[in-house]
A protein has these predicted regions:
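Hydrophobic, well-ordered secondary-structure scaffolds
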Residues: 17-19, 168
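Extended, subdomain-level signal for the structured scaffold at the beginning of enzyme domains
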Residues: 27-135
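Bacterial N-terminal signal peptides that target proteins for export
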Residues: 1-15
Length: 225
């Protein structure tokens, strides 16, 4: 009986240890791929920053971005929805060898080796729209944040729309209050806890000293800057 109980206890302990280890393997973002990621980049890769306000996509601007990326391999980062934006880039904008989309749901995924390999080989990186507070929480001070800076330093283009634009300035509205403060509330208490201006995210020389945000008139946001 004693030996049986001991075996049961050891088995239970082993299951607990396994359960404790599982999150380390589960921290992987959703991944969507279109095209051939091993194909040769057709054109010359050049530096460039694309800042899109959001809403309807400007295809002329997107084609400029794809050309800056040598019409090669694009990696899209986001923290909501799925791979639709990659389908749009590949099937509607067109003219690229491949597009990979990673959808993050936690900070741990920003250390995933597969993500970092994709970012290192990317000809262009695009930050999708969404909730910029997730981007701050998931990417600031992580290997993904460092990879974005390294990408730009290497002379490759970086783009973003809406929240993905907001993340590019040296200073940005982070929406860390759990909402999206509007002008009357921000101006009533400009130094209050709802006015979350963040920094120490990306270190882009062209946007040094610049604060970025979007949807000013449509969503009554100008006062929060």
């Amino acid at each position: 009986m004693v030996s049986v109980l001991g075996a049961v206890r050891r088995g239970a302990l082993g299951m607990l240890l396994l359960a404790a280890a599982l999150p380390a393997f589960a921290a992987k973002p959703a991944h969507y791929v279109l095209g051939d990621v091993s194909a040769r980049t057709p054109g010359k890769v050049e530096p460039g920053l694309l800042l899109m306000g959001g809403g309807d996509r400007n295809f002329e601007a997107m084609r400029w971005f794809m050309k800056k990326a040598g019409n090669g391999h694009i990696v899209v980062l986001r923290a909501s929805q799925a791979g639709e934006i990659g389908e749009e880039f590949f099937n509607e904008v067109g003219g690229i060898a491949s597009v990979e989309t990673y959808v993050f749901s936690d900070r741990e995924s920003a250390s995933d080796p597969a993500v970092l390999r994709s970012l290192k080989r990317a000809d262009g990186i695009f930050l999708a729209g969404g909730d910029q507070s997730r981007y701050v929480r998931y990417w600031r001070g992580t290997p993904v944040g460092a990879a974005l800076d390294a990408h730009v330093r290497a002379g490759k283009p970086l783009g973003g729309t809406s929240a993905g634009l907001a993340m590019q300035g040296e200073y940005l509205y982070g929406a860390m209050d759990g909402g999206s403060v509007i002008s009357p509330h921000a101006l009533a208490d400009p130094l209050g806890p709802d006015n979350t201006i963040e920094t120490d995210f990306l270190q882009l020389a062209l946007l040094k000293g610049v604060i970025t945000d979007t949807h000013f008139s449509e969503r009554n946001r100008l006062g929060r800057l």
